[in-house]
Amino acid sequence: MLKKNKKANSNNSGATAYSPLAYLKRPYFKRSKACPLEQCPNEDIDYKNKGLLSKFTSEYGRILPSRITSVSSRKQRLLSTAVKRARYLALLPYC
């Protein structure tokens, strides 16, 4: 929200001036999230592991993005290929 000063502009147009602090951006702090599959070896991410794969899919059957699940990019690739294989073999729904 922009804060208005009570002073009028010097050109007497009747408009109010905005505070210069209103235009500064807030500092952005990126939170470091640990990968939930960090301790899980790559062999456990398999198309037959239906319980693990269902944690990373939505209720409509879509693969959740890594920004929501905080999975590393390597594990996200393994998850996506495993989910696609499980869908092809009818272990997971396409919905």
Curated annotation (Swiss-Prot):
BP terms from Gene Ontology: translation
Keyword hit for Ubl conjugation: no
Entry keyword set: Ribonucleoprotein, Ribosomal protein, RNA-binding, rRNA-binding
Cross-referenced Pfam families: Ribosomal_S18 (PF01084)
Any Gene Ontology CC annotation: cytosolic small ribosomal subunit
GO MF: small ribosomal subunit rRNA binding; structural constituent of ribosome
Domain of life: Bacteria
Quaternary structure note: Part of the 30S ribosomal subunit. Forms a tight heterodimer with protein bS6.
Record's function text: Binds as a heterodimer with protein bS6 to the central domain of the 16S rRNA, where it helps stabilize the platform of the 30S subunit.
Family: Belongs to the bacterial ribosomal protein bS18 family.
Name the record gives this protein: Small ribosomal subunit protein bS18
